[in-house]
Amino acid sequence: MNILLATASFVLSLGFVKAEPTRHHDRYAYIERVVCDVNFPDLLCRRKSHAIAYRMFRLIPVRNPNYEISTDYVSHEFNTTRVRSESEKYLCSSYGPNGYVSGDVFILRNALNKLFDHHEIEELAYELFIRLVASFLDSCSYPKSFEHNLVRCRSEDEELCTSPLAAFIKLVSRRSTRDVVLIVLNDFSHYLKLEEGHGFSKDRKSNQCVKFTQLYFYYLSAAVNFIERKISAFTLIPVMDDRRIASVSAIMISSKFANTTGNYVINATSFMDNTIPF
């Protein structure tokens, strides 16, 4: 009898072990710096320049290495405060398992313009905030009703229709969404600390990538810190510490949300709020 019980226990344990995910769960999303050569068409000749962008990835699937992303590359020459023409905007898309191309373009184009136009940190901060969150939401799976609300805050050319400040107030007014916002900001802030002084810029003479200016990282870091202070003041709660981030991530990312293709998706049902348009 004891032998049978031991055998049954062993078989069950094998089953549970087999059911465990076979890979370590990374943070649900991360931002990657992209540096590339871009050809800008001209009336007389074709010029090549370097472009820098940030793009947000979803979790790399367990069995399918594809992902959804849409990235907008923009020239960032320091004597240029605005994108010179629409021909200098290039779109690079990767298709996800279902063939869907992300509708959101994450490049912080307006934020970069504000930075080089010497706009106030507050204005940059809200713009950065809403594009970070919109990019995160667009890189994961969430209910169609929330997708409808999200699309309504952007126009066809991806410009924001809703005030970034209004979107900020809506997102931080709900606990579940606020936690996600703080995680996104924490990730981006950590990324900036790691990358400070290691970014790239174009050297005009050699046309080679050189270290990016410290001022860029200073402005973005200051913008993130500003938003975190606003959240703390708005909600009367401290910014999330590592333990709380880990616990929220563990709730949001779970093997039970894995679909048939092996993609880990975000449990975003708590985002649904049909009473207030986004």
Swiss-Prot record:
Q: Name one GO cellular component term.
A: spore wall
Task: Provide one Gene Ontology biological process annotation.
Answer: sporulation resulting in formation of a cellular spore
- The SS bond pairs are none
Q: Is-annotated flag, keyword Hydrolase? A: no
Residues annotated as coiled-coil are: none
Q: Which residues form the signal peptide?
A: 1-19
Give me the glycosylation sites of this protein: N79, N259, N267
Give the domain of life: Eukaryota
Keywords, A to Z, come to: Glycoprotein, Signal, Sporulation
Q: Where in the cell is it found?
A: Spore wall
> What name does UniProt use for this protein?
Spore wall protein 30
**Organism per entry:** Nosema bombycis (strain CQ1 / CVCC 102059)
Query: Could you tell me the gene encoding this protein?
Result: SWP30
